[in-house]
Amino acid sequence: MAFPYPQLVLFGDSLLQHSAETLDGFSLQSALQTRCLRRLDVINRGFSGWNTANAIKFIDQIFPKPSDASPRIKFLVVLLGANDAVIPLPTTTQHVPLEQYKKNLDAIVNHPHILAHDPKILLVTPPPVDEIRLKELNLAEGHPCAVRTSAISASYSETARQVARDNPHVVSIDLWTAIMDKAIALTPDEYTEGGPLLGTPDNGNRGGLATLLPDGLHMNGDAYRVLYGLLKPHIGEEWVSLPVEDRTGYLFPDWRELAG
């Protein structure tokens, strides 16, 4: 009989798909796998370009019902919304209205196939965007304006927080605030507390977002390090403080046990 490893699943859009890559010397997926080595398999189910409507359409196929022969999902990290927040224009197709986004997120974190695994669900807010950089790139791509704005994207992040608040079994991971705080810390002279945010036309400065979000949307290695720092306290608490020789949680025995 096979003994499949429990899983930590990363479910979302390109922000999680790209977490498998090594960027600026850091890979989020690799860091999580190292933290969970021999105890959990880290599975990447990030789909570039997807919104919550796409996720709902395929969720039954992505998350099968648990069975004796299939792995149990112990942790589920969900990060969706960056594409839902795309402005509806003749040149765009990804927009999901805010209220529907909320319903979709709620349906995902309460899907019966997922709940049957009884995972710890970590719902990550979409990060901020650098609207100044996005406008440059989007105009060059033929769009009439930036297809994402800081204000609209922030409203989707707040909705993700609300979904977590509404569901006691869901943990909120506030990536939006953490990335913005990091960007401000990198360039404090370009932001005044209470004033327009970095990356907005009203501010006029990209600040630290220019480093953390090189194309205005996708994260660099330092931004993924921020996300790792947010996830880490919720994953592996039961073994990270153990002595190095303690193999609690290993699915298969340590070689010393076999040698004995």
Positions of the model-derived regions?
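Serine-esterase "nucleophile elbow" of acetyl-processing enzymes
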Residues: 1-54, 59-71, 76, 240
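Alpha-helical cap/lid subdomain in secreted, periplasmic
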Residues: 31, 57-260
